[in-house]
């Protein structure tokens, strides 16, 4: 393990990102989000009033000083590709800055699409090698968080690791959804199990397990060697968590990086924020978190901006209807192009170009872009997919049986409404 002085840290914080390439795994469908991902990959799902989920990983790279990125796509990639082309095309290739789109290719040696997360990188090795990076940062494109990857790179170099895995404690009852690890006093990973049925607890806290966040730093040459070896293994599932990380752990070359060391927070006393919005309830809750008085995730931090594609839209407008009722909101996010006419919106997130007509009451709802809400509607604890036309007088979120019959209702009572569901009920979706 190498001990570095403060000046060395500052120098490495500038140099290491320039020697790195980030690969963002963005090909997943996200089946637990149900119909929300029928026509788009999970990283392309809207979030936070104006963003896409992948904007967080991309923005973290830019803010960390990493200017070379590859986005690995597969499932329903058109929306994702379009978003990146529109919103992330400001790089200067002459300065060796870029975002490369790396789709599944079905290469000549086989007929498989990506067989796993590791295989997604393996199939693009010929392209990735041309980047001539010293370090490769592997990221999931479907998590919500702010992280300075330069701090993780420094930790990787200081510990003399060949592979570093970002980790954080999670409640033990949730740990089966993650890779779970045990570490020694130097953060060397001594045991790693992917999605165990009975997760081991942390020695100092029996209520929690130490979970992998799916964020990795590799020495580039070591990663390429591992991937080529894994590609030849017919018994491998070609996945980082299931195959590569356990193998590296056995070799004694994997170290853990505690997420609090690199989590970017405006309030140093706040809990580190990282969310896997993989279920409808988690997605709904993470959106509404941003509408709270003091949200856990600070989206207003000028020192760590989250970038996205910005349309040219007029400001949101709140107007009174013909009866004199005023449009008003409380504890809500309302994006550009929205019009609220004589209705009340409480603790909700309205994306761009949403129109709420008179006499409506909207509470704890997430309305994606271009939703049209007819008069006298009541919407509660729901997610309304893009461009839905909610007919006049419709009530959602008040009758569990009725919601489950017409739409998708989760076990937690969150209702998802899509255009296809509304069409099946006989409601036209063209305005």
From Swiss-Prot:
Changing residue 113 to A: Insensitive to activation by fructose-1,6-bisphosphate, but still binds fructose-1,6-bisphosphate, with similar affinity as the wild-type. AMP causes similar inhibition on the wild-type and mutant. The record marks 74, 113 as: Could play a key role in the communication between the regulatory and the substrate sites. Keywords: Allosteric enzyme, ATP-binding, Carbohydrate metabolism, Glycogen biosynthesis, Glycogen metabolism, Nucleotide-binding, Nucleotidyltransferase, Transferase. AMP binds at residues 40, 46, 52, 130, 370, 386. GO terms for molecular function: AMP binding; ATP binding; glucose-1-phosphate adenylyltransferase activity; identical protein binding; magnesium ion binding. Its EC number is 2.7.7.27. The keyword Nucleotidyltransferase applies. HAMAP family: GlgC. Displays cooperative behavior and a bibi mechanism with sequential binding of ATP and G1P, followed by ordered release of pyrophosphate and ADP-Glc. This is Glucose-1-phosphate adenylyltransferase. The gene is glgC.
């Amino acid at each position: 393990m190498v001990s570095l002085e403060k000046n060395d840290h500052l120098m490495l914080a500038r140099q290491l990102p320039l020697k790195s390439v980030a690969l963002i795994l963005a090909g997943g469908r996200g089946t637990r989000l149900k119909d929300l991902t029928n026509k788009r990959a999970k990283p392309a799902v809207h979030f936070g009033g104006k963003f896409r989920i992948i904007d967080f990983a991309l923005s973290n790279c830019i803010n960390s000083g990493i200017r070379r990125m590859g986005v690995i796509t597969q499932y329903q990639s058109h929306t994702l590709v379009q978003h990146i082309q529109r919103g992330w095309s400001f790089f200067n290739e002459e300065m060796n800055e870029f975002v490369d789109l790396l789709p599944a290719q079905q290469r000549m040696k086989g007929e498989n699409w990506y067989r796993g997360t590791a295989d997604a990188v393996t199939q693009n090795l010929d392209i990735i090698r041309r980047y001539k990076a010293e370090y490769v940062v592997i990221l999931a494109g479907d998590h919500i968080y702010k992280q300075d990857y330069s701090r993780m790179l420094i930790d990787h170099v200081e510990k003399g690791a060949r592979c570093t895995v970002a980790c954080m404690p999670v409640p033990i009852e949730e740990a089966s959804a993650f890779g779970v690890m045990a570490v020694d006093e130097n953060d060397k990973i001594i045991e790693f199990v992917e999605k165990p049925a009975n997760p081991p607890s942390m020695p100092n806290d029996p209520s929690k397990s130490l979970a992998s966040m799916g964020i990795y730093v590799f020495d580039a040459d070591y990663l390429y060697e591992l991937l080529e070896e894994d590609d030849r293994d017919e018994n491998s599932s070609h996945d980082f968590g299931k195959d590569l990380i356990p193998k590296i752990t056995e070799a004694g070359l994997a170290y853990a990086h505690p997420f609090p060391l690199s989590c970017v927070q405006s309030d140093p006393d706040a809990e580190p924020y990282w969310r896997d919005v993989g279920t409808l309830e988690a997605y709904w809750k993470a959106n509404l978190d941003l509408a709270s008085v003091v949200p856990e995730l600070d989206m207003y931090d000028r020192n760590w901006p989250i970038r996205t594609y910005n349309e040219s839209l007029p400001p949101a407008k709140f107007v009174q209807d013909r009866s004199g009722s005023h449009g008003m909101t409380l504890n809500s996010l309302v994006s550009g192009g929205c019009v609220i006419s004589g209705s009340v919106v409480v603790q909700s997130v309205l994306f761009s170009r949403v129109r709420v007509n008179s006499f409506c009451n909207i509470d704890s709802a997430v309305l994606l872009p271009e939703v049209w809400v007819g008069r006298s509607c009541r919407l509660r604890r729901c997610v309304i997919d893009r461009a839905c036309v909610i007919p006049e007088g419709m009530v959602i979120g008040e009758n569990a049986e009725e919601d489950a019959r017409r739409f998708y209702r989760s076990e937690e009572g969150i209702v998802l409404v899509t255009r296809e569901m509304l069409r099946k009920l006989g409601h036209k979706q063209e305005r």
